[in-house]
Amino acid sequence: MSNQPTPTLDLPPPPQVAGISLAGTKPYTISADENRALCESIGVAPTADGTAHPIYFYIATQVGMGMTVAGLCSVCEFDVEEGPMMASSKVTFSRPLVTGQPYQITGRIVSLVRKPSRKLGVMDMLEYSLELSLPDGTPMLATTNVWVLPRRRLA
C-alpha cells in the first residue's frame, strides 16, 4: 500500500445560491378531498377531526414554495431532466396540519456543496429549508431537505 495522497479533482465551484429565498407567493391549502384521496391511496382512513396526513409536510412545502422543482434545479444550474435525487428530509412539527386551513411557506437555500463521488463522478449536495406557518405567523413545521444533483459532465 502506498502512502501517496489520493488525487483530487480540480472542480469548478458550484453556483453561489445560498440565501436565495424559496418563499411562496400564495397560501397553500390542503383540501379535505385531496387528503381523503391520499389517505385512500395508501390504505388509511382520513381522520374525522380534519387532521391532514403527515406526508403533507413535504407536499405542502414543495408545492407551496416560491419555485417549482425545475426552477430550483435551474437556479443551481442543473437540468431537472438529469435526475435530482433526494438524500434526506427532516421535519419538526409544531402542531398537526389540518384540512381547509391556508398555510404560508417560507424558506431559503442553505448551501450547494460540490464534491467528488465514486458512483456519480461529481455531485452537488443541495440543502434547503422550508417553514410552513399560519397566515398570522404561527409556526406549524420546519423541514430541511438535501438533494443530490449528479454532475456527470464534470466527471
Predicted regions and their residues:
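HotDog/MaoC-like acyl-thioester-processing domains
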Residues: S2-P15, F93-A155
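Hot-dog-fold acyl-thioester-processing enzymes
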Residues: S2-S88, L154
